Amino acid sequence: MSILFIADVHLCNTKPKIIHGFLNFLYNHAMQAQALYILGDLFEVWLGDDEKNIMHMTIAKGLQSLHKKKVPCYFIRGNHDFLLGPKYANLCDMILLPDSQVLKLPSGKNVVILHGDTLCIDDKSYQRLRNFLHCQILQKIFLSLPLSMRLYIFNCARTFCIKYKKYKLKQNLHIKLQTVIDMLIKNQSKILIHGHTHQPAIHNIQISENISFKRIVLGQWNKYGSVATINEKNDDINLIHFPLNKQ
Protein backbone atom coordinates (compact mmCIF):
# COMPACT_ATOMS: atom_id res chain seq x y z
CA MET A 1 0.00 0.00 0.00
CA SER A 2 1.05 3.58 -0.63
CA ILE A 3 0.74 6.92 1.12
CA LEU A 4 -0.80 9.52 -1.22
CA PHE A 5 -0.06 13.25 -1.35
CA ILE A 6 -2.06 15.83 -3.32
CA ALA A 7 -2.40 19.63 -3.37
CA ASP A 8 -3.82 22.47 -5.43
CA VAL A 9 -7.06 20.82 -6.50
CA HIS A 10 -8.74 24.26 -6.37
CA LEU A 11 -12.30 22.95 -6.23
CA CYS A 12 -15.00 25.44 -7.21
CA ASN A 13 -18.51 25.31 -8.64
CA THR A 14 -17.38 26.72 -11.99
CA LYS A 15 -15.18 23.67 -12.67
CA PRO A 16 -17.46 20.62 -12.36
CA LYS A 17 -15.03 18.35 -14.24
CA ILE A 18 -12.42 18.81 -11.52
CA ILE A 19 -15.03 18.12 -8.82
CA HIS A 20 -16.09 14.95 -10.61
CA GLY A 21 -12.48 13.88 -11.18
CA PHE A 22 -11.56 14.46 -7.55
CA LEU A 23 -14.53 12.44 -6.32
CA ASN A 24 -13.55 9.60 -8.67
CA PHE A 25 -10.05 9.77 -7.22
CA LEU A 26 -11.44 9.49 -3.68
CA TYR A 27 -13.80 6.62 -4.41
CA ASN A 28 -11.22 4.64 -6.39
CA HIS A 29 -7.50 5.35 -5.93
CA ALA A 30 -7.61 6.81 -2.42
CA MET A 31 -9.71 3.93 -1.08
CA GLN A 32 -6.73 1.62 -1.63
CA ALA A 33 -4.21 3.87 0.12
CA GLN A 34 -2.54 3.66 3.48
CA ALA A 35 -3.32 7.35 4.04
CA LEU A 36 -4.13 10.53 2.10
CA TYR A 37 -2.42 13.86 2.76
CA ILE A 38 -3.94 17.00 1.22
CA LEU A 39 -1.30 19.74 1.26
CA GLY A 40 -3.48 22.81 0.87
CA ASP A 41 -5.64 24.60 -1.69
CA LEU A 42 -8.20 21.84 -1.86
CA PHE A 43 -10.68 24.66 -2.48
CA GLU A 44 -10.26 27.72 -4.67
CA VAL A 45 -11.63 29.87 -1.86
CA TRP A 46 -12.80 29.29 1.71
CA LEU A 47 -14.66 32.06 3.52
CA GLY A 48 -15.51 30.14 6.68
CA ASP A 49 -16.88 26.84 7.88
CA ASP A 50 -20.41 28.25 7.88
CA GLU A 51 -20.37 28.51 4.06
CA LYS A 52 -21.69 25.06 3.25
CA ASN A 53 -23.01 24.75 -0.30
CA ILE A 54 -23.82 21.60 -2.26
CA MET A 55 -20.23 21.24 -3.46
CA HIS A 56 -18.83 21.46 0.07
CA MET A 57 -21.24 18.81 1.32
CA THR A 58 -20.53 16.54 -1.66
CA ILE A 59 -16.78 16.76 -1.04
CA ALA A 60 -17.34 16.13 2.67
CA LYS A 61 -19.27 12.97 1.86
CA GLY A 62 -16.45 11.77 -0.39
CA LEU A 63 -13.85 12.37 2.31
CA GLN A 64 -16.07 10.68 4.90
CA SER A 65 -15.99 7.56 2.73
CA LEU A 66 -12.23 7.28 3.33
CA HIS A 67 -12.76 7.32 7.07
CA LYS A 68 -15.35 4.57 6.75
CA LYS A 69 -12.75 2.48 4.92
CA LYS A 70 -10.24 3.28 7.67
CA VAL A 71 -8.07 5.38 5.35
CA PRO A 72 -6.98 8.42 7.39
CA CYS A 73 -7.05 11.80 5.65
CA TYR A 74 -4.82 14.67 6.80
CA PHE A 75 -5.08 18.30 5.75
CA ILE A 76 -2.62 21.21 5.71
CA ARG A 77 -4.17 24.57 4.87
CA GLY A 78 -3.03 26.42 1.75
CA ASN A 79 -3.09 30.08 0.80
CA HIS A 80 -6.56 29.70 -0.77
CA ASP A 81 -8.22 27.79 2.07
CA PHE A 82 -6.29 28.91 5.15
CA LEU A 83 -9.59 29.72 6.90
CA LEU A 84 -10.80 26.12 6.73
CA GLY A 85 -11.42 25.23 10.35
CA PRO A 86 -12.14 22.31 12.66
CA LYS A 87 -15.91 22.31 12.06
CA TYR A 88 -15.61 21.45 8.38
CA ALA A 89 -12.60 19.20 9.00
CA ASN A 90 -14.63 17.21 11.53
CA LEU A 91 -17.51 16.99 9.07
CA CYS A 92 -15.10 15.47 6.54
CA ASP A 93 -13.37 13.26 9.13
CA MET A 94 -10.13 15.02 8.19
CA ILE A 95 -7.31 15.60 10.65
CA LEU A 96 -5.96 19.16 10.57
CA LEU A 97 -2.18 19.50 10.64
CA PRO A 98 0.01 22.56 11.29
CA ASP A 99 1.58 24.53 8.43
CA SER A 100 4.42 22.01 8.25
CA GLN A 101 4.61 18.45 9.51
CA VAL A 102 7.24 15.73 9.75
CA LEU A 103 6.08 12.21 8.89
CA LYS A 104 7.99 9.16 10.00
CA LEU A 105 7.83 6.32 7.48
CA PRO A 106 7.83 2.67 8.62
CA SER A 107 11.49 2.55 7.57
CA GLY A 108 12.27 5.32 10.06
CA LYS A 109 12.88 7.99 7.42
CA ASN A 110 11.44 11.45 7.99
CA VAL A 111 9.41 13.31 5.34
CA VAL A 112 8.66 17.03 5.64
CA ILE A 113 5.31 18.11 4.17
CA LEU A 114 3.82 21.60 3.77
CA HIS A 115 1.80 23.64 1.31
CA GLY A 116 4.84 25.48 -0.02
CA ASP A 117 3.99 29.18 0.07
CA THR A 118 6.26 29.74 3.07
CA LEU A 119 9.20 28.56 0.95
CA CYS A 120 8.80 31.46 -1.50
CA ILE A 121 10.73 33.84 0.71
CA ASP A 122 11.89 36.04 -2.19
CA ASP A 123 8.31 37.27 -2.53
CA LYS A 124 8.60 39.70 0.37
CA SER A 125 5.25 41.38 -0.25
CA TYR A 126 3.41 38.05 -0.20
CA GLN A 127 5.12 36.95 3.00
CA ARG A 128 4.10 40.21 4.69
CA LEU A 129 0.52 39.73 3.45
CA ARG A 130 0.52 36.14 4.66
CA ASN A 131 1.65 37.15 8.14
CA PHE A 132 -1.11 39.78 8.20
CA LEU A 133 -3.84 37.37 7.05
CA HIS A 134 -2.77 34.72 9.54
CA CYS A 135 -3.25 37.08 12.49
CA GLN A 136 -5.70 35.25 14.78
CA ILE A 137 -7.46 38.44 15.87
CA LEU A 138 -7.98 39.55 12.27
CA GLN A 139 -9.32 36.14 11.29
CA LYS A 140 -11.74 36.15 14.23
CA ILE A 141 -13.08 39.57 13.20
CA PHE A 142 -13.41 38.53 9.55
CA LEU A 143 -15.23 35.29 10.37
CA SER A 144 -17.66 37.18 12.61
CA LEU A 145 -18.87 39.23 9.63
CA PRO A 146 -21.96 38.17 7.66
CA LEU A 147 -21.10 35.79 4.83
CA SER A 148 -22.27 38.33 2.24
CA MET A 149 -19.80 40.90 3.62
CA ARG A 150 -16.98 38.35 3.60
CA LEU A 151 -17.76 37.53 -0.03
CA TYR A 152 -17.71 41.23 -0.95
CA ILE A 153 -14.34 41.73 0.75
CA PHE A 154 -12.95 38.64 -0.97
CA ASN A 155 -14.09 39.80 -4.43
CA CYS A 156 -12.49 43.21 -3.88
CA ALA A 157 -9.25 41.59 -2.75
CA ARG A 158 -9.26 39.16 -5.68
CA THR A 159 -9.69 42.01 -8.19
CA PHE A 160 -6.69 43.76 -6.68
CA CYS A 161 -4.60 40.57 -6.68
CA ILE A 162 -5.38 39.85 -10.35
CA LYS A 163 -4.13 43.31 -11.32
CA TYR A 164 -1.12 42.97 -9.06
CA LYS A 165 -0.11 39.61 -10.51
CA LYS A 166 0.33 41.19 -13.95
CA TYR A 167 3.36 43.02 -12.56
CA LYS A 168 4.75 40.23 -10.40
CA LEU A 169 7.93 38.51 -11.47
CA LYS A 170 7.37 34.81 -12.08
CA GLN A 171 10.60 34.09 -10.24
CA ASN A 172 8.89 35.11 -6.99
CA LEU A 173 7.04 31.79 -7.13
CA HIS A 174 10.31 29.91 -7.20
CA ILE A 175 11.42 28.07 -4.10
CA LYS A 176 14.56 29.21 -2.31
CA LEU A 177 16.84 26.17 -2.39
CA GLN A 178 18.69 27.08 0.79
CA THR A 179 15.37 27.37 2.64
CA VAL A 180 14.53 23.81 1.58
CA ILE A 181 17.94 22.50 2.65
CA ASP A 182 17.76 24.28 6.01
CA MET A 183 14.29 22.86 6.69
CA LEU A 184 15.38 19.33 5.81
CA ILE A 185 18.49 19.50 7.97
CA LYS A 186 16.52 20.97 10.88
CA ASN A 187 14.03 18.09 10.73
CA GLN A 188 16.64 15.39 10.06
CA SER A 189 14.94 14.53 6.78
CA LYS A 190 16.03 13.95 3.20
CA ILE A 191 12.59 14.24 1.57
CA LEU A 192 10.31 17.29 1.28
CA ILE A 193 6.89 17.34 -0.41
CA HIS A 194 4.93 20.49 -1.22
CA GLY A 195 2.57 22.14 -3.70
CA HIS A 196 1.73 25.81 -4.34
CA THR A 197 3.98 26.54 -7.34
CA HIS A 198 2.04 24.36 -9.83
CA GLN A 199 5.40 23.17 -11.22
CA PRO A 200 5.30 19.38 -10.68
CA ALA A 201 8.67 17.65 -10.57
CA ILE A 202 10.99 15.52 -8.49
CA HIS A 203 14.16 17.49 -7.77
CA ASN A 204 17.32 15.73 -6.64
CA ILE A 205 19.49 18.05 -4.56
CA GLN A 206 23.09 16.87 -4.39
CA ILE A 207 25.00 18.58 -1.58
CA SER A 208 28.08 16.37 -1.62
CA GLU A 209 29.12 12.93 -2.73
CA ASN A 210 27.42 11.39 0.30
CA ILE A 211 24.60 13.84 1.03
CA SER A 212 21.54 14.32 -1.17
CA PHE A 213 17.92 15.37 -0.75
CA LYS A 214 14.68 15.03 -2.70
CA ARG A 215 12.08 17.76 -3.21
CA ILE A 216 8.77 16.57 -4.66
CA VAL A 217 6.53 19.29 -6.08
CA LEU A 218 2.87 18.40 -6.57
CA GLY A 219 0.97 19.65 -9.61
CA GLN A 220 -2.24 21.63 -9.94
CA TRP A 221 -5.36 19.69 -10.85
CA ASN A 222 -6.83 20.79 -14.16
CA LYS A 223 -7.23 18.39 -17.06
CA TYR A 224 -4.99 16.02 -15.13
CA GLY A 225 -4.82 15.03 -11.50
CA SER A 226 -1.47 15.01 -9.73
CA VAL A 227 -0.50 12.70 -6.88
CA ALA A 228 2.76 11.68 -5.24
CA THR A 229 2.98 8.18 -3.81
CA ILE A 230 5.35 6.67 -1.28
CA ASN A 231 5.42 2.88 -1.06
CA GLU A 232 5.42 2.06 2.64
CA LYS A 233 7.44 -1.13 2.08
CA ASN A 234 10.43 0.22 0.17
CA ASP A 235 10.00 4.04 0.32
CA ASP A 236 9.82 4.29 -3.49
CA ILE A 237 8.52 7.72 -4.53
CA ASN A 238 6.52 8.38 -7.68
CA LEU A 239 4.83 11.47 -9.06
CA ILE A 240 1.82 10.47 -11.14
CA HIS A 241 -0.43 12.47 -13.46
CA PHE A 242 -3.69 11.03 -14.72
CA PRO A 243 -6.54 12.37 -16.89
CA LEU A 244 -9.51 13.29 -14.74
CA ASN A 245 -12.02 12.02 -17.29
CA LYS A 246 -10.49 8.51 -17.54
CA GLN A 247 -10.31 7.13 -14.02
Curated annotation (Swiss-Prot):
Protein source organism: Blochmanniella floridana
Upper classification of the organism: Bacteria, Pseudomonadati, Pseudomonadota, Gammaproteobacteria, Enterobacterales
Cofactor dependency: Mn(2+)
Keyword Manganese among UniProt keywords: yes
Family: Belongs to the LpxH family.
Bilayer topology term: Peripheral membrane protein
Protein name: UDP-2,3-diacylglucosamine hydrolase
Residues involved in Mn(2+) 2 binding: 41, 79, 115, 196
The protein's Enzyme Commission number: 3.6.1.54
Binding site for Mn(2+) 1: 8, 10, 41, 198
Catalyzed chemical reaction(s): UDP-2-N,3-O-bis[(3R)-3-hydroxytetradecanoyl]-alpha-D-glucosamine + H2O = 2-N,3-O-bis[(3R)-3-hydroxytetradecanoyl]-alpha-D-glucosaminyl 1-phosphate + UMP + 2 H(+)
UniProtKB keywords: Cell inner membrane, Cell membrane, Hydrolase, Lipid A biosynthesis, Lipid biosynthesis, Lipid metabolism, Manganese, Membrane, Metal-binding
Annotated Gene3D superfamilies: 3.60.21.10
InterPro entries in alphabetical order: Calcineurin-like_PHP_ApaH, LpxH-like, Metallo-depent_PP-like, UDP-diacylglucosamine_Hdrlase
Pfam annotation, one family: Metallophos
One Gene Ontology cellular component annotation held by this UniProt entry: extrinsic component of plasma membrane
Subcellular location: Cell inner membrane
